[in-house]
C-alpha cells in the first residue's frame, strides 16, 4: 500500500514540479519562515543548500517582539525586546499565544494576567491595545502583530538576497487548529506575503534531519518543545518521502510556562521576605522575567545561577540563587506531562518504543537536561540524535519545502505526507458522530459517504460538521452547520445525499452535500469565522476518548467522598439538634465539642468544594475521631454507636 502511495505521491510531485516550472518566474525565491512564540527564524534554499539568514543585529534568530516608543517609533525584533523593561506597556510579544483564539479561551484569560500590555475583547477575540506615541492609543489584532514580525523576517531575507520576496512557506505547531492556521495565513497576507504552504513544525524539523538520509525506511520521533508550544510527531522517512504517521501535542506548553513558574516562586518569596507585592509594578515583573529566562538558560550547563536585579522594586535590589534542582521541582509536573503525547503517538501508530530508529529533539526547551533525561528514560536509555540545531531546524525544513515550491531541482525528490490531528464527521440520527475522516489521516484527502432522510417527505437535511473523538456529537466540537434544501418528496431512506469532506494541504476543511437525485448542491468552508476550537478543547478531545473512563471514575470518587463528608456532617448536625436523638442524651460539654467540630467541617466544605479525595477523607477522619469516642461513651456497650450515616444510606443526593 505504502509503495503505491509513494509512487502516486512522486507522480503528483513530478506533475506539481511541471506546474511549478511554469510559475517559477512569478514566485521568485520562496523563503521558509519559522514563526515561533519566543523566536522566529528565516531560511532560503540557495545553491543546493539551506542558508539561515542573520538579521540586522547579526542574530540568526529574532525575538517576535513589537514595541511602540513614546516618540512614535515602531521597533521589531531585538530592538523591541531590549527595551521591554523600560516600556513594558507598549512592548508586545506572545502574539502566537493569542492568534486564532477566542476571548473566552481559558488560556487567553490565563495569559493576559501575566502580559504587561493591555489585551481587550473585540468581536469575541483578544486584541492588543497600546500607546503608539503622542498619546495615541491603537488596537491591533494578534494577526497584525504577527504580520509585523513576518515583515521583519521578509526584510531580513530581502537584505540578504538583494531582491524582493513575495512568497513564503510558514510553519505552525502540528496541533494548531483550523482557526489558528487560517489566522497565520492572514498574517502573511497582511505582511505582503503569499503563504504558499502552511507546514507543521515537527514535519519541517524531520526534513532538516532526514534530507540527506537515504539509507532505507526509518521511524523518526520528533519531540518539539519550544517557547510556547509542544508537538510530538512520528514519521517514517524513506528516500525523500516523509510520511507523518501520528501527531499529538499541547499548543500551550513551553519555555514561557517554565519561566512563569519560577517567576511566581520568586514573587512569593520576595513578598514573604519584604511584605511587598511586586505584581503591581510592571517594570519589576518584566525585569524578573528577563533575568529568570537568563538563569534558566544558564542552568542547562551549570547547577546554579544567581539572579541579581539592581533597583528591582521601590529602589531595593533583588538577589537570589536558583538551583537546577529547584527549577526542576517547580516544573516537574509540566516536564512529566510531555511524556503523555509521546505515549499517545506510539499507540496511534501501533509501534513499540524499540521500533523508533531516531529521536529528534527540536526547540530551545529541549536543552533542559531534565527534559533530555525524561526522553532518554522513556525510550529505555536510547540517546536522542544531536545532529541538528534545535533553534534552526524548523526554519531549515521550511526553506527546503520553499525550495521545492519554487521549483529548485537541487532539493531532489521530496514528498511530504502530513496528517489531520482530529477525527472529522457529521451528526446522524440520535446525535451519533458518524466519522468520515479519522484522526491521523494523511492530507490532502477527500472522503464521500451516502446518507438519507430520517422521515417521509423530508424537504431539507441539516448537515452538522463536528470534530473530535467521542461517539456522540454532544461531546465533540461543532465546526459548522448548513442546510441542503429542495429534496423531492419521498419515503424516508429513499433520497441519496452524498456528503464529501475535503482537506487541503494546509489542513483547511471544505464540506459539500449533494442530492444525487436532483444534483442540488451546497457547501461550507470551515474557516476562521466558524469559531473553531480552542487548543484546550483539541487537547481534551484527542485524549478524551481513552481518558474519559478513567477521569469519570476519579471525578465520581471525589464527588462521592465529598458527599460522604457532607452527609456525615449534616446528619450529625441534625441529630445533635434533635432532642429525641443525640441532642437529648449528650452532656452540654460534649454537645458543644461536637457542634464546634461539625460546624468547622461544614464551613471548610463550603470554601473547599474542589479539594482532593485525600482532603475529604482526612476531614471525615478528623470528625470521626472527635465524635466517635463521645458516642461510644454515651452508648457504652449497648450495640454499635450511630455513625451519622444511617439516614443517607443508598440515597444519591440530587
From Swiss-Prot:
Q: What does its PTM field state?
A: In unstressed cells, AMPylation at Thr-518 by FICD inactivates the chaperome activity: AMPylated form is locked in a relatively inert state and only weakly stimulated by J domain-containing proteins. In response to endoplasmic reticulum stress, de-AMPylation by the same protein, FICD, restores the chaperone activity.
The region called Required for interaction with ELAPOR1 is annotated at 1-80
**Cellular location of this protein?**
Endoplasmic reticulum lumen; Melanosome; Cytoplasm; Cell surface
InterPro entries given in the database record: ATPase_NBD, BIP_NBD, Heat_shock_70_CS, HSP70_C_sf, HSP70_peptide-bd_sf, Hsp_70_fam
Q: Where is this region: Substrate-binding (SBD)?
A: 420-500
What family does this belong to? Belongs to the heat shock protein 70 family.
What's the domain remark here?
A: The interdomain linker regulates the chaperone activity by mediating the formation of homooligomers. Homooligomers are formed by engagement of the interdomain linker of one HSPA5/BiP molecule as a typical substrate of an adjacent HSPA5/BiP molecule. HSPA5/BiP oligomerization inactivates participating HSPA5/BiP protomers. HSPA5/BiP oligomers probably act as reservoirs to store HSPA5/BiP molecules when they are not needed by the cell. When the levels of unfolded proteins rise, cells can rapidly break up these oligomers to make active monomers.
UniProt function note: Endoplasmic reticulum chaperone that plays a key role in protein folding and quality control in the endoplasmic reticulum lumen. Involved in the correct folding of proteins and degradation of misfolded proteins via its interaction with DNAJC10/ERdj5, probably to facilitate the release of DNAJC10/ERdj5 from its substrate. Acts as a key repressor of the EIF2AK3/PERK and ERN1/IRE1-mediated unfolded protein response (UPR).
Stated name of the protein: Endoplasmic reticulum chaperone BiP
Organism annotation: Pongo abelii
